[in-house]
C-alpha cells in the first residue's frame, strides 16, 4: 500500500450510480454528469465559484443508464448528451433556465429503440460530418446510428460474451475485446450492413477478461486494454507493445494528457486496483502511486476550473463520487529529522527495565490475558412430529438445533457451515449480527433426507467471521428418535454386533423409553422414509446385547446409542465388544470388485466413443463427396454403437453410486471399530472420517495411519533393529556352522 494518498476536494454520494462523464456545456470548462441504475441523470458543476457541490439539474428517466457520451451528434447543435439504456439510445440537449447559468434542464430530442438489450457503445468520429455512435448488444451484434438515422443494425460478431469496444480514426479500425480475445475489424466492412459474420483482420488471446479499452490516435496509434490481472498495449498490426502485470485486480483505467509536458510519444494512464490503489504510468513505467481510500470502478481526469486542472474524478461501487488531486505528504508517518541525537546509554537502560518487567510478568503467569474470541454453544431444541421441507423423507420428524453465540462484539456477519449426513434446509447459513449486540442465536432444523440415508447422527457446526478471521467449531449428536421409528424385529438379519457387559442386562423398553415397545428383550427400529431396519436383542444368561441388521451402516449408530444409554443407566459398568473385521474384509472385496468392473466400463466407453466419432467422420465425408449409398449402413452402425455407449455410461454411473455406498458402509465400520476399541481404552486413528473426506486411495490412507498411529513398543523395536548391531539379550543366536551340523 502506498504511503501517499489522494487529497479529497469535492465528494458526494448518489445511490445506485452506474457511470460518470465529463462534458463541457458552457464557459469552456468541464461539468460532471452522473448516471444511475434507477434512471437518474445529475449534472453537477464542481468548478462553480460559490460552492463545489453545485448541481445544475437532475432528471429522472424510466430506464437504467449503461453509458453516456457528449459530442456534436446533430448538425447545428453543440454538446448533445447521448444516453445508452438497455432498450434505448436517447439524445438530450442542455438548456439553461437562468441567465447566470446556475440552473439547467435536460430536454429529450429523440431516441432509438432496440429489440435486443444493449451492452455498451463507442463514438465513431467522422471527418467533416457529425460523429456516429456504434452500439453493441448483449448477443454481440453491432448497430450504427448517425443522428436520427440508423446506418445499419444487428451486424453479428463471432463471439458469445460481449466486451469493451473502441475505434481508431487514424486506421479506421474497430477493436472488440469479446470472449477474452482482442480483434481488429476494418470499419469499411460493416458499412454495407450485411448480416453475415465479419472476419477479423487479426486477433489476440488476452488470457483474461477485458474490463476497459482505450484507443490513442496519432502516427503510432495504440490500443490499450485493461484486464483483471494485466494491462496490455497493441499497435495497429496486433503486436504487443508493452504489458503491465497487476498485483491486485484491475478495476478502472483512464488516459490523460499532461498540461506541462506536450509529448505525445508516451501514453499516460491511471489504473485503479481492488486494494484501493491508484497507479500512474507512462506507458509501462510506474511514475507514481497513491492510496485512493476506495476501490474506484470509474476514473476521469477533468479540468473543472483554472485553479483545479487535471483533477482526478473517481466513482465507488456504493455511489460515492470523489474529485481530488494527488498529495505529496505521507499520511502514515513522518521520518525523524537528521539532527536528533540518540543517547544510546539511556536507551540500553530502558530496554533492560522493559526486559525485566517482561520476565516478572511471565513468572507471575503473564499480565496479558488471551482473548477468547467468539463463543458458540449447541443445544437440542424442539422435536416436531413432521417436517414440511421438500428434501425430507416421508413423515420424517424434525429437530431444531439451537446455535447460540456470545462475545460477538464488532461482528456484523457470521458464516455458518454445516457438516451432517442428516438433511437441513441449507448447508451454509449467513447470520447477521447487530453491531450493538454481544449475543446472537439461530435455530437450524435437521431431519432424514429423501435422497440419502444417514449413517450417523453427528452434526458439526463451524462459524467463521471474515472480519476477525476467527473460526469456532462444535459437534453434537441428534436424538435417536429423529432418525428412527419403531418397527418389527428381524432375527434373521445377516450382519451382527455383540456388546458384552459385566453386569446383568437392562430391559430394552426402559433403555429406549421414548418408544412404545413393551418387550424388555427385543426392539426393532426402521429409518424414516425407508425400509432399512435394525433390531436390538438382550440375553439375560450371557449378559449380552446383540444388534442385527441387513444394512452395515446402521450397526454403528445403533451400537453407539445403546452403549451410551447403558453407561447412563449404570455408571461405572464395564462394556466391551468384538470388532467385526470379517465385515470389513467383505466390504473391501466388494469395493475392489466394483472398481474392476468400473475400469472395464471406462474402457468400453472410450472404445465406443472413438467408434461413434469415426462413424460421424465417415458420414460427414460421405455427405461432402456425395456418396450417399452407404448412409443406411452407417446409420445402423451408429445406432448400435450409440446404444452400447449409453448402456456403458449407465452401468458406469450405477457402479459409481454402488462404490460410494460401499465406501460409506466401510467408513461406518471403521467408526464402529473405533468405538469398540475405545471401550477397551484403546484410541485409534482409524475412525469413520480418516478416509471419508480425502481423494486418496484406501491403501495410501492406511500407510499414513500405520506411520502415524504406532505404539511405543513398535518404535522401540524399529530403532533397535536399525541402530543396534549387537546380539539381543536373553535370545540365543546360533551360528551358521552349528545350524549346518544339526542339519547334517
UniProtKB/Swiss-Prot annotation:
Residues 734-744 have a biased composition (Acidic residues). Disulfide bonds: none annotated. The keyword NAD does not apply. Residues 722-744 are annotated as: Disordered. Residues 722-733 have a biased composition (Basic and acidic residues). Keywords: Cilium biogenesis/degradation, Protein transport, Transport. Component of the BBSome complex. The BBSome complex is thought to function as a coat complex required for sorting of specific membrane proteins to the primary cilia. The BBSome complex is required for ciliogenesis but is dispensable for centriolar satellite function. Required for proper BBSome complex assembly and its ciliary localization. Required for cilia biogenesis and both the assembly and movement of intraflagellar transport proteins along the ciliary axoneme. This is Protein pthb1 homolog. It comes from Caenorhabditis elegans. The lineage of its organism: Eukaryota, Metazoa, Ecdysozoa, Nematoda, Chromadorea.
Amino acid at each position: 500500500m502506498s504511503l501517499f494518498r489522494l487529497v479529497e476536494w469535492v465528494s458526494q454520494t448518489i445511490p445506485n450510480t452506474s457511470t460518470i462523464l465529463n462534458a463541457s456545456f458552457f464557459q469552456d470548462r468541464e461539468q460532471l454528469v452522473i448516471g444511475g441504475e434507477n434512471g437518474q441523470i445529475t449534472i453537477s458543476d464542481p468548478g462553480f465559484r460559490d460552492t463545489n457541490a453545485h448541481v445544475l439539474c437532475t432528471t429522472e428517466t424510466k430506464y437504467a443508464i449503461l453509458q453516456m457520451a457528449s459530442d456534436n451528434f446533430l448538425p447545428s447543435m453543440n454538446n448533445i448528451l447521448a444516453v445508452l439504456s438497455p432498450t434505448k439510445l436517447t439524445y438530450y440537449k442542455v438548456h439553461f433556465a437562468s441567465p447566470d447559468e446556475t440552473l439547467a434542464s435536460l430536454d429529450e430530442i429523440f431516441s432509438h429503440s432496440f429489440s435486443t438489450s444493449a451492452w455498451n457503445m463507442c463514438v465513431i468520429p467522422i471527418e467533416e460530418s457529425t460523429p456516429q455512435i456504434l452500439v453493441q448488444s448483449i448477443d454481440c451484434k453491432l448497430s450504427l446510428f448517425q443522428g436520427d438515422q440508423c446506418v445499419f443494425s444487428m451486424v453479428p460478431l463471432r463471439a458469445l460474451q460481449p466486451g469493451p469496444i473502441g475505434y481508431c480514426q487514424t486506421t479506421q479500425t474497430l477493436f472488440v475485446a469479446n470472449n477474452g480475445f482482442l480483434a481488429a475489424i476494418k470499419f469499411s466492412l460493416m458499412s454495407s450492413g450485411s448480416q453475415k459474420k465479419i472476419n477479423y483482420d487479426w486477433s489476440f488471446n488476452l488470457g483474461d477478461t477485458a474490463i476497459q479499452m482505450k484507443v490513442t490516435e496519432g502516427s503510432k496509434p495504440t490500443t490499450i486494454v485493461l484486464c483483471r490481472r494485466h494491462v496490455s498495449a497493441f499497435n495497429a498490426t496486433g503486436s504487443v507493445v508493452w504489458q503491465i502485470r497487476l498485483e491486485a485486480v484491475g478495476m478502472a483505467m483512464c488516459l490523460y494528457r499532461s498540461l506541462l509536458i506536450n509529448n505525445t510519444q508516451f501514453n499516460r494512464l491511471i489504473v485503479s486496483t481492488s486494494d484501493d490503489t491508484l497507479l500512474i504510468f507512462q506507458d509501462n513505467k510506474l511514475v507514481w502511486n497513491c492510496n485512493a481510500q476506495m476501490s474506484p470502478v470509474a476514473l476521469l481526469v477533468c479540468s473543472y476550473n483554472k485553479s483545479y486542472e487535471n483533477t482526478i474524478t473517481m466513482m465507488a461501487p456504493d455511489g460515492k463520487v470523489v474529485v481530488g488531486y494527488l498529495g505529496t505528504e505521507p499520511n502514515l508517518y513522518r521520518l525523524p529529522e537528521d539532527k536528533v541525537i540518540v543517547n544510546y546509554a539511556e536507551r540500553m537502560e530502558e530496554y533492560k527495565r522493559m526486559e525485566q518487567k517482561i520476565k516478572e510478568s511471565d513468572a507471575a503467569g503473564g499480565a496479558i490475558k488471551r482473548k477468547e474470541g467468539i463463543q458458540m454453544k449447541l443445544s437440542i431444541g424442539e422435536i416436531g412430529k413432521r417436517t414440511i421441507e421438500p428434501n425430507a423423507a416421508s413423515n420424517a420428524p424434525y429437530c431444531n438445533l439451537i446455535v447460540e453465540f456470545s462475545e460477538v462484539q464488532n461482528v456484523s456477519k457470521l458464516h455458518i457451515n454445516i457438516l451432517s449426513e442428516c438433511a437441513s434446509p441449507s448447508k451454509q447459513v449467513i447470520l447477521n449480527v447487530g453491531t450493538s449486540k454481544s449475543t446472537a442465536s439461530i435455530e437450524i432444523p435437521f431431519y432424514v433426507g429423501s435422497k440419502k440415508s444417514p449413517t450417523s447422527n453427528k452434526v458439526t457446526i463451524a462459524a467463521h467471521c471474515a472480519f476477525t478471521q476467527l473460526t469456532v467449531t462444535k459437534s453434537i449428536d441428534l436424538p435417536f428418535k429423529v432418525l428412527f421409528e419403531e418397527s418389527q424385529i428381524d432375527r434373521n438379519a445377516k450382519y451382527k454386533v455383540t456388546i458384552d457387559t459385566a453386569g446383568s442386562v437392562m430391559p430394552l423398553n426402559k433403555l429406549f423409553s421414548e418408544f412404545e415397545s413393551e418387550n424388555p428383550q427385543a426392539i426393532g427400529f426402521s429409518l424414516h422414509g425407508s425400509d432399512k431396519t435394525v433390531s436390538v436383542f438382550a440375553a439375560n444368561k450371557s449378559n449380552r446385547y446383540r444388534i442385527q441388521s441387513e444394512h452395515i451402516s446402521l450397526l454403528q449408530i445403533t451400537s453407539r446409542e445403546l452403549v451410551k444409554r447403558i453407561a447412563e443407566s449404570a455408571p461405572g459398568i464395564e462394556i466391551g465388544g468384538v470388532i467385526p473385521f470379517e465385515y470389513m474384509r467383505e466390504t473391501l472385496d466388494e469395493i475392489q470388485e466394483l472398481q474392476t468392473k468400473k475400469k472395464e466400463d471406462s474402457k468400453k466407453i472410450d472404445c465406443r466413443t472413438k467408434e461413434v466419432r469415426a462413424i460421424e467422420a465417415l458420414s460427414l465425408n460421405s455427405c461432402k463427396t456425395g456418396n450417399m449409398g452407404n448412409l443406411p449402413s452407417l446409420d445402423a452402425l451408429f445406432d448400435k454403437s450409440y446404444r452400447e455407449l449409453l448402456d456403458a455410461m449407465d452401468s458406469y454411473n450405477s457402479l459409481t453410486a454402488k462404490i460410494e455406498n460401499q465406501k460409506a458402509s466401510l467408513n461406518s465400520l471403521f467408526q464402529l471399530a473405533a468405538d469398540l476399541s475405545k471401550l477397551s481404552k484403546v484410541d485409534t486413528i482409524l475412525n469413520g472420517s480418516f478416509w471419508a473426506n480425502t481423494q486418496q486411495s484406501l491403501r495410501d490412507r492406511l500407510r499414513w495411519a500405520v506411520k502415524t498411529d504406532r505404539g511405543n513398543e513398535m518404535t522401540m523395536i524399529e530403532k533397535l533393529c536399525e541402530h543396534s548391531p549387537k546380539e539381543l539379550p536373553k535370545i540365543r543366536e546360533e551360528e551358521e556352522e552349528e545350524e549346518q551340523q544339526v542339519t547334517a
